[in-house]
């Protein structure tokens, strides 16, 4: 079994961003087609619930809101069995992008707007149908017993690199107060990979050292053969200097 060596990397932690979610004054909701549909000063769960159709009630006198929809409503009549087969008149407003019904009013100039059930999502890409199915499955089956959590255990996750091989990343998070935390991640690699990389680096370093030594001596590897030939030739005779010369 190959040995595992860890090395540290720099990473960012998004845990602190969740601390400021409650301080946001406005909440943005989107249609199922990811088109922005509602800006509200509170969450939809805080609005009154209409039990007849599970719609949320927005009163313009109590909550600041901005609705985005098709300005031309569609008038429909609904028969309510719970109210003695009464007829309810609705002016339904659709999404500008996908024409999905989002809101309805009992009169076009009313200050009370009803948000239809599961028509809006908080984040783009959410699927309310999947959430409903998951909630029903959780309600019908008993949840398994939770495993005891380890207090000091690291959080392990996997990252797939460019070669398609999974690299294990271990994250250690340390809380530094209410609004601060430090996360240190380590990547676990096999010792064979690290050894191969070190050998390649050592070969490159040795080649650079040899080249520098040859440059100091006066040439490169290609000049060694030429230098040996020049060294074999006899040195030139020195010119004699002076006024008294023997003849």
From Swiss-Prot:
Modified residues (Phosphoserine): 127
Name of the protein in question: STING ER exit protein
Region (Disordered): 215-247
Function: Molecular adapter that stimulates membrane curvature formation and subsequent endoplasmic reticulum exit site (ERES) establishment by recruiting PI3K complex I, leading to COPII vesicle-mediated transport.
GO biological process: endoplasmic reticulum membrane organization; endoplasmic reticulum to Golgi vesicle-mediated transport; mRNA splicing, via spliceosome
InterPro entries hit by this protein: STEEP-like
Similarity comment: family membership: Belongs to the STEEP1 family.
Domain of life: Eukaryota
A cellular component annotation (GO) from this entry: cytoplasm
Keyword annotations: Coiled coil, Phosphoprotein
Coiled coil regions, renumbered to chain: 195-216
């Amino acid at each position: 079994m190959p040995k595992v060596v860890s090395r540290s990397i720099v990473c960012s932690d998004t845990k602190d961003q969740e601390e400021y979610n409650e301080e946001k004054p406005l909440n943005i909701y989107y249609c199922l087609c990811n088109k922005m549909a509602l800006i509200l000063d509170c969450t939809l769960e805080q609005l009154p619930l209409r039990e007849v159709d599970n719609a949320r009630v927005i009163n313009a006198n109590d909550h600041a809101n901005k609705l985005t929809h098709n300005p031309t409503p569609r008038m429909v009549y609904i028969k309510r069995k719970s109210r003695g087969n009464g007829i309810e008149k609705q002016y339904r407003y659709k999404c500008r992008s996908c024409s999905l019904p989002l809101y309805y009013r009992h009169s076009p100039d009313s200050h009370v707007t009803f948000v239809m059930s599961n028509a809006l999502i908080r984040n783009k890409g959410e699927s309310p149908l999947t959430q409903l199915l998951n909630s029903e499955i959780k309600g019908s089956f008993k949840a398994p017993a939770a495993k005891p959590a380890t207090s000091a255990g690291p959080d392990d996750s996997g990252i797939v690199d460019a070669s398609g091989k999974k690299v294990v990343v271990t994250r250690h998070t340390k809380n530094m107060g209410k609004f601060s935390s430090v996360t240190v991640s380590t990547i676990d690699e096999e010792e064979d990979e690290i050894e191969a990389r070190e050998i390649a680096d050592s070969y490159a370093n040795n080649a650079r050292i040899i080249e520098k030594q040859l440059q100091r001596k006066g040439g490169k590897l290609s000049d060694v053969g030429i230098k040996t030939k020049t060294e074999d030739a006899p040195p030139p005779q020195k010119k004699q200097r002076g006024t008294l010369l023997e003849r």
